[in-house]
Amino acid sequence: MKLLKKPAGLKKRKVISKRIKIEKKPSSEDEGSSDEEVPKLDGEGSLDGSEDEDDGTVTVEKGGVKKHKLDLEKLKQSDPEFFKFLQQEDADLLNMEDDGDDDEDDDEDDEDEEEEESDDDEDDEEDDDKTKIKKIRKPKIKSDNSGRLIVDSNVYSYLQQVLVLDDETSTPTNPSDVRMAVDVFVACVARVGADIEAPKYVINEQSIFEAVVRMCFQAMPDILKRLLKAKPEGDKVLFSKTAIKKYQTYVRTYLHAMIVFLNEVQTTEVLIATIKAMTRLVDLYAHFSRMSKLLIKAVVRIWSRKTLECRLPAFVCMNLLVKNYPQHFVPLYKTAYVAFVANSKIVTNETWPLLQFMHRTFAELTILNPEQAYKYAFVYIRQTAVHLRNAMISKGRKDLIFSIYNWQMMQCMYMWVRVIAKAHSVNGAEQIGELVYPLIQVIVGIFKLCNAPTFLPLRLHCCQLLIQLQASCTNYIPILQVSCDCLEELARELKSKPKPVKGAVKLPDIECTLKCSSQFSDLPQWRKVISEHVFRTMMQSAHLLASQAAFPDVVLPINHRISAILETMKNGDHAHLFRGFQTKLKEHSRFVLDVLARKSVDINDEMQVRAVRFDLNNPDSPIKTFYRQWEKVWKMKERSAVENSKKDDKKKKKEEEAAAAKKRKPNETVEDEDDVKPEVSKAKRKRIKIGAAAKKADASVPDQFADMSMWSDED
């Protein structure tokens, strides 16, 4: 452009000089050639021998044209380079054509130069429609004593007009406004209490802080995607590489600020809103490896520690990241497993639903990429087997035994049972389904590690794990034999006389207990609870085998063993309970034998085998009828137990509140009770009398009358 501007100036000067020569032509020549006209070009007015400055036309007579041609020939001989330039740049001048006044040409050239300069200053991403849009003036931002800019209502309204757009397709995104919004959000993060460097902006009002955070959560995901020229491709979103390189500094700043904000806030509503906003930015987080690692740590922390309302959106974010970007599966899977183990040490009635939620969601993550998950599932199950082997060969070392008999180990077993059960119900996860065999061996090994009666609740948990595996994987597991071991331990405990206790005793929940202390083991209430859970285990295991043709053969040794155990059981109530179960086993054995006797079954014929299974799966069979009746009674007992625990919790809260109210000192005296003086010791009276008034107001104490304008005379 610089090379073109200099000849343009020369061109204008030459044109003016030639026109002056034409105008000085004698009048005699002008009169003789006034009848002929030069033809009209490019929409200009007719050349009638007069010069009109208003309409931009110039009239030249015949003699003037000849003189002009002679001058051009002389110019061609004297300065051929300039003549060649005129041919290339202004051929109309050589053809005696004029495009308008010189002043208008100058104005047009100036406008072209201004447009070129403005185009050079604009960013590559801005659209051509920007000149048609009204420009929003930036407000004047005040600064505090430290030099930081204060975010007030004017700044917020400006950002809202710029970021929250009605027409998202045609309106361009200004990078400077996005940078300003990122800096303002960093100020919000600093206000929350994050340990970061002093930001460029500062927010002093709580209302402005909440409004800015809400606006950023709502608008920034779409703004950043538009700035980076996001293009959806299936479930993924691709970004322009040039835009990523150009704007990655403050895109990274915003993504990191979101993670810091998530780690600092504690309110459930704010946590949920933050996770939802970050879920919309998963595509950006996945693009940056370091940001994705920080996102995984932050989201997994909420998935494993917070309330159920917060864990659900956290899992949605985890699932979306792993599903669309499989390269992040391994770090997330390992982080989630470690977080689960670390946060499963304590199990109560309140934490059981949270742990079960983690079991289900971890199984869902495993099914998303079963090939990668199999490697780590195998290693983790093998690790539990190594711990079990060390405890078995330790010859009774308590520290190694308790490394197995704890809630972390049992919760890992519950989780892997859920994972393998899920794998058996999904196509393509056969590798994980094959891990059922080592898992069964580990659970049975945990069951047989220690036969002490204090660990009877843990052994019942092992039975429940085996029941879940058999129900979901259709593999035969000798659960009835294992449950008979529990019945033998119960019979040993029942040999000793129970210790009666006066009044009501709150027993520990066996679902949240692995070890029974000696103070409860001798109580008749506890023995009753244990016998009911042993009966439940035997009922469920028998119900799983009810539709199998091998039921009589499996149950025959179990009946003999139960009879031998009941002979040693002195308590009549417990013996009566298990004798009823034994009679039902015998009745169902006869039912199965009758069904098999009525039909001739060829094992190689699949249709005959299915017909026999259909007949054995009769809902009116003895075991299934007895199971339905028992299940109704069991659910009623569970409901009553839950209601009683809620009532006890309410009573405890009321008692605690009453005790706290008694301890709390009254801050104000009531006018009606002025005559009644509380009993105060003499030493306290002396202290009250001697105490001096404060000389100066304490500035550190917040003003408790700040909302006095909201009061009324009636209050």
Swiss-Prot record:
Region listing for Disordered, in residue ranges: 17-71, 85-132, 638-715
Gene Ontology biological process terms in this record: cell differentiation; gonadal mesoderm development; negative regulation of transcription by RNA polymerase II; ribosomal large subunit biogenesis
Domain of life: Eukaryota
Phenotype upon loss of function: Worms exhibit slow growth and sterility caused by germline proliferation defective phenotype (Glp) or proximal germ cell proliferation abnormal phenotype (Pro).
Record's keyword annotation contains Plastid: no
Compositional bias (Basic and acidic residues): 638-660
Function, in words: Required for normal somatic gonad development and for regulation of germline development and proliferation.
Name this polypeptide is given: Nucleolar complex protein 2 homolog
Organism: Caenorhabditis elegans
Lineage: Eukaryota, Metazoa, Ecdysozoa, Nematoda, Chromadorea
